[in-house]
Swiss-Prot record:
PANTHER family, per the entry: GLUTAMYL-TRNA(GLN) AMIDOTRANSFERASE SUBUNIT A, TRANSAMIDASE
Protein name per the record: Glutamyl-tRNA(Gln) amidotransferase subunit A
UniProt record, GO biological process: translation
Active-site residues from the entry: K77 (charge relay system), S152 (charge relay system), S176 (acyl-ester intermediate)
Protein family: Belongs to the amidase family. GatA subfamily.
Main enzyme class: ligase
Organism (species): Acidobacterium capsulatum (strain ATCC 51196 / DSM 11244 / BCRC 80197 / JCM 7670 / NBRC 15755 / NCIMB 13165 / 161)
InterPro entries reported for this sequence: Amidase, Amidase_CS, Amidase_dom, AS_sf, GatA
Record text on subunit structure and interactions: Heterotrimer of A, B and C subunits.
Pfam families for the chain: Amidase (PF01425)
Keywords in alphabetical order: ATP-binding, Ligase, Nucleotide-binding, Protein biosynthesis
Function (record text): Allows the formation of correctly charged Gln-tRNA(Gln) through the transamidation of misacylated Glu-tRNA(Gln) in organisms which lack glutaminyl-tRNA synthetase. The reaction takes place in the presence of glutamine and ATP through an activated gamma-phospho-Glu-tRNA(Gln).
Length: 476
């Protein structure tokens, strides 16, 4: 797909170098031209966005200088709520639902002057690795329309890649920001658990879910993260650790930084072209002054089963609230309360969501809790300890983001296990609670984007972004 324009940076819009209304019109033009094929946006607020952009343009230079996102057009994954706007989680079960509250991360962007364009397609309830599980149709990868954009935040990644937004928000439970960023050739950031409020997020797995940004550049992603990060009294898991200026040391380079390369992430199953691109980038970082050290994260082989036990268990509890009683879809023919619950959930949930609810209910059931859920929590602790030990020796860890470039639409739809393995390099960070990012580092022979994953200590997003900026600079 050919793109007619290159969107301005956040800085260009914020400073008034590019008018807010002009930036918005560029995004809307791309949406009108490409969304019919890509299917990234589920809903748009054209009138509200236009009024907001004109308001920002009418501000004085002094007033605009107080708004770190002044006039920046952005979209949000449709698992984040906005008061009065439809919230679907890409599921039929939330048909017609308009929440009475706005997610904190979204509100912080709006308060900072950003212009909300609309809400973005995703896998249903954020469950998926390809964005083929949406009740509103799959998202297509703007880099190759026969390929998936990744999941579950495929719409958020595709919107940035197709110039439909300067930046977007997604969520990441097991790789749902980083893997789509890799597949679509954009930057995606996973904040530390607790760094960004989850208030207003329609939950999948509450101990794993994070909210984070997509952008064209590391600097733009860093600026968005700086706005949405910070303590929120509305989220009991929100951290009060101070938020630094993420742009302050972006250009410091990697000289003197210790970068760990875990052997377990370069084993069987890694596509040769991904391996070539990532290893080539690591060598460039070494040449730029980084100290590259081999490390081991020995419990990595247990990460996928551990993740799918814990995530599905939490999902089965979180999704119990969708029953047709207070909001969303209600089965019209049910004549008893039990029948209404059963029929509503059968009509409203897609196949992948049902699969995960069943698995989660099973691992929490009497007789299986100790064998599966309790054991998974013990392995989760071992995975976290692997990272704690590694970060005693290194400042950041670099790996492939995904084992392959974007695969073809429909290629893995009938093979859930193969689909789950697409997250093999990303679920560990969610289980350990650490931060990370995916930054483009090359392309395959077919021209498909490849991303490198950078993982950092708890609340050390600044170092992750610093390494990401170095990677980005090396690609130019």
């Amino acid at each position: 797909m050919e793109f007619q324009t290159t969107l301005p940076s956040i800085r260009a819009v914020r400073t008034g170098e590019v008018r807010a209304e002009a930036a918005l019109q560029e995004c809307l033009g791309a949406i009108d031209a490409h969304n019919g094929e890509v299917n990234a946006y589920l809903s748009l607020d054209r009138d509200g966005a236009g009024a907001r952009a004109r308001h920002i343009d009418a501000l004085s230079r002094e007033e605009r200088a107080k708004l770190p996102m002044g006039g920046v057009p952005f979209g949000i994954k449709d698992v984040l709520t906005v008061e009065g706007m439809p919230a679907t989680a890409s599921s039929k079960i939330l048909e017609g639902y308009r929440p009475p509250y706005t997610a904190t991360a979204v509100q912080r962007l709006i308060d900072a002057g950003a212009v909300l364009v609309g809400k973005l397609n995703c896998d249903e309830f954020a469950m998926g690795s390809s964005n083929e599980n949406s009740a509103y149709g799959p998202v297509k990868n703007p880099r190759a329309l026969d390929r998936v954009p990744g999941g579950s935040s495929g719409g958020s990644a595709a919107a940035v890649a197709a110039n439909m937004a300067v930046a977007t928000l997604g969520t990441d439970t097991g790789g749902s920001i980083r893997q789509p960023a890799s597949f679509c050739g954009v930057v995606g950031v996973l904040p530390t658990y607790g760094r960004v409020s989850r208030y207003g997020l329609i939950a999948f797995a509450s101990s794993l879910d994070r909210v984070g940004p997509f952008a064209h550049t590391v600097r733009d992603a860093a600026e968005v993260l700086g706005v949405i990060a910070g303590h929120d009294p509305m989220d009991a898991t929100s951290s009060s650790v101070p938020v630094p200026d993420y742009t302050e040391k972006l250009d410091a380079g990697v000289k003197g930084l210790r970068l760990g390369v875990p052997a377990e992430y370069f084993a069987e199953g890694l596509d040769p072209e991904v391996k070539r691109a990532v290893e080539g980038t690591i060598e460039q970082l070494r040449a730029a002054g980084a100290e590259v050290k081999p490390i081991s994260l020995p419990h990595t082989p247990y990460a996928i089963p551990t993740y799918y036990v814990i995530a599905t268990a939490e999902a089965s509890a979180n999704l119990a609230r969708f029953d047709g009683v207070r909001y969303g879809l209600r089965a019209p023919e049910a004549n008893t309360l039990a029948a209404m619950y059963r029929q509503t959930r059968d009509l409203g949930f897609g196949a992948e969501v049902k699969r995960r609810i069943l698995l989660g209910t099973y691992v929490l059931s009497a007789g299986y809790y100790d064998a599966y859920y309790k054991k998974a929590q013990q392995v989760r602790r071992l995975l976290a300890q692997d990272f704690l030990r590694a970060f005693e020796e290194v400042d950041a860890i670099v790996t492939p983001t995904a084992p392959t470039p974007a695969f073809k639409l429909g290629e893995k739809s009938d093979d859930p296990l193969s689909m789950y393995l697409a997250d093999i390099y990303t679920v560990t960070a969610n289980l350990a609670g650490i931060c990370g990012a995916s930054v483009p580092c090359g392309t395959s022979r077919e021209g498909l984007p490849i991303g490198i994953q950078i993982l950092g200590r708890h609340f050390d997003e600044a170092t992750v972004l610093r390494v990401g900026q170095a990677v980005e600079s090396l690609q130019k």
